[in-house]
Every structure is written in C-alpha cells, then in structure tokens.
Amino acid sequence: VSAILKKGSSWYSSMGNDNAKGTKVWALSGNIKYNGLMEFDMSTTFHEVIEDVCGGISKKKELKVIHAGGVTGGFLPPSKADTPLDYESLLDAGVLMGQASFAAYDESACVIDLAKFSVGFNEAETCGKCTPCRIGLTLIKNKLDDISEGRGKLEDLDKLQSLCEEINVTALCGLGETAVKAVLTGIKYFRAEYERHIVDQICDAARCTGLYKYVVKEEDCVACGACIKPCPTGAITGGTRKVAAHIDMDLCINCNACYEACGFLAIV
C-alpha cells in the first residue's frame, strides 16, 4: 500500500494485463523447491512461478499436475502451465483463483487421490442445507472410493461428470458450485489416469493402496516373521521356521502394514 501511495495508481496499474491490473499474493506449495506466500504481477504464468521463483520441481522430477484454487479449485496438466494468473485466464482454463493458492505436484501424485481429499474436505464443510451439496458430494466421494479401491467401472466417469455438472448449477452457494472442480477438471485433463485405475487397476503413483495386490517373493523372504504382527486381519501365514510368508488376499484389507514392515523388499 505504501508503494502505491508513493508511486501512484498508474504505476500499480502498469503491472498485470488487460484482464487484471496490479499484483496478487499467492500461497504456493507442493513438490517445489521453495514454497510460501509470494506476490506476483497478474500476468505471470504458472510456468514462470514454478521455474523462476520456486526453483522448479524438487528432486529434478517432472511436473505432473497443478492444483489451482485450493480445495475448491481444479487440476491443470503441464500443457496449461503457460496460463497467466489472472481471473479470466484461469476461468478459461477451467479453474478458479479461489483462495489464491496453487500446488504443483510431480509424478508421485495421484489425481484421483487428490480429488478424494478435496471432495472429502468439502463434504465435511457443507452446511447441509441444499440436497445437491449434502447428498451429491457423498455420492461423488463414494464413486471415487470405488475407483481407488478396484470397484470402479468405465461408466462411472460419465456418471461422475453428470453429477458434478448438476451440483455445479443447482447448489445454493459458492462452496457447492466449486466443490466439484477437482473432479470435473480431473476427468477432463486426466481421464487416462482414471481409466488406468478402472481398467488396469493400477495406480502409477502408488497412492491408491486399495488397488494393491500383495505378493511375497519366496526367494527374497527370510522367514523373519516381521510382517505377521503388523497385519490387523491375520492374513499372513508362514513367515517363520524357514517357511516363506503367504498373504491371503481374501483377508487382506490393503493397509500396507506388511509392505512397510518387510526390511528385505520381499513383499511387492
């Protein structure tokens, strides 16, 4: 404010673009080297912020997804990284400025997992007054759970999109209208990832543990028994007295406890 008073409004309005003048403070997070609150010219692009200001994606990995607008925001692929950070450009890309925050993630992130978090947060925050938001978000969350746990079907994608569009136009407040952005943009830009979860039942980011099918590599198992005690359902037999462990997938709940307990990488 002091700089504007000193230099004048014309100086401040010289920054930005035709859609929006001046600057904006953004909250930056995700798999970037430097995060925090930073102020930018409104004409600055995602790419410029990530590479020139935040030091790029950490650990020399590649950008996979930009989550713009916070929990009520949406997802953008790397091809949209040249989008300026002004209101109209973000709307044209299918997302919102929202809380003026964005997170940049590498390939270790799963779009379905991120969408589940956003929808789950918004479901918990709904006041419950309108049916689209109160019931609709629960239905969407259940569908996302099905996809991430191996029960999804390809027709679920069209159902999800239709339900999200219905909530978007019938919810009574801004929360309900934007609560489904993560799902809509996820299906639009990352449909192949949704289909891989459904058809191949594989999460390349290894975030959806419900898709795991655990197998013990007998040649690597030393029968130490370390995997038996952490298992909450007693799904593991053997593993002692020189007998390799065996996992009963009918009892397994995909909690990942055995995988984390094995120090010999015998469980895959």
Please state what every model-predicted region is.
Residues S43, C127-C133, C173, C221-C227, ...:
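Short cysteine clusters
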Residues S118-F121, I202-A223, G234-N254, L265-V268:
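Ferredoxin-like iron-sulfur electron-transfer modules
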